[in-house]
């Protein structure tokens, strides 16, 4: 039994397919007890003429997204929560807070997809890895993830080692980065997303991997589950493996959210 899938997208982001009702139907078929829609927040950090096509909803679509998911929650045969995935860009925290403030989300998920303007998880920008030092990339990525958690704007930190997506691994031992990230996350009071989407990409591994997840457990960080579904058929995909991983390191419960308040479900 999958207790929750807290990371579903919608067509509003421009790179997902299917109606939200189809995502719900798939969740019901799989026996998932609760889902959270977590679509991409508009790109608050870019001027209107510099927007990235098919990356996130437009700013004028955000109220409609909120209303759509709230209406869906009233009608669906399972628990549906309203979340949002917000990119962290250092120096843009006030703009981010201002965009989030008018809406009552059940949870706000923070993510890092850009390193100083480089969309490192975009296949179109993958060649940039060959032009940079991989250890420096990892250091910068985890520094940004730590800064994001410290803003206090996020309930959940998404796919915490997304930097490994294309299976480029650091030469240096990453454990010091992992330990420091766990300490910062714990002090910030965030929950970690165990995200199964990595199984669908070259890395072929859940985010976070076993070593990092073990460190998160040792630091007492709570976890939640997310498939990062951009198609109805990806709802719940890989979450049985994610649950197995979670249990293997010692977790016996996962987090759910309502009105940005955390609750726990036994697994």
Predicted regions, residues:
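Long, positively charged, glycine-interspersed low-complexity recognition regions
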Residues: 209-267
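Conserved beta-strand positions
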Residues: 37, 110, 159, 194, ...
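An N-terminally biased module of ancient metal coordination in phosphate/nucleic-acid-related enzymes
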Residues: 1-90, 95, 99-100, 164-167, ...
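Structural motif
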Residues: 30, 103, 151-152, 219, ...
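Conserved, mostly hydrophobic/aromatic
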Residues: 7, 27, 108, 159, ...
């Amino acid at each position: 039994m999958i207790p929750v899938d807290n990371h579903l997208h919608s067509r509003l982001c421009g790179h997902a397919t299917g109606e939200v009702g189809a995502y719900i139907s798939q969740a019901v078929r799989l026996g998932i007890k609760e889902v959270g829609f977590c679509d991409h927040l508009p790109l608050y950090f870019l001027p209107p003429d510099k927007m990235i096509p098919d990356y996130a909803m437009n700013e004028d679509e955000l109220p409609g997204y909120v209303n759509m998911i709230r209406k869906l929650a009233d009608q669906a045969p399972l628990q549906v929560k309203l979340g949002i995935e917000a990119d962290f860009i250092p120096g843009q925290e006030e703009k981010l807070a201002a965009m989030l403030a008018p809406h009552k989300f059940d949870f706000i998920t923070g993510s890092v997809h850009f390193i100083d303007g480089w969309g490192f998880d975009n296949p179109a920008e993958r060649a940039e890895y060959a032009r940079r030092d991989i250890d420096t990339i990892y250091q910068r990525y985890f520094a940004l993830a730590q800064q994001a958690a410290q803003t206090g704007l996020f309930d959940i930190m998404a796919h915490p080692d997304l930097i490994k997506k294309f299976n480029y691994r650091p030469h240096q031992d990453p454990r010091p980065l992992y330990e420091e990230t766990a300490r910062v996350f714990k002090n910030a009071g965030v929950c970690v997303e165990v995200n199964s989407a990595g199984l669908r990409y070259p890395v072929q591994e859940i985010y976070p991997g076993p070593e990092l997840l073990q460190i998160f457990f040792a630091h007492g960080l709570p976890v939640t589950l997310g498939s990062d579904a951009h198609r109805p058929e990806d709802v719940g995909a890989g979450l049985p493996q994610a649950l197995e991983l979670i249990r293997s390191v010692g977790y016996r419960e996962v987090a759910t959210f309502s009105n940005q308040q955390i609750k726990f479900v036994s697994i």
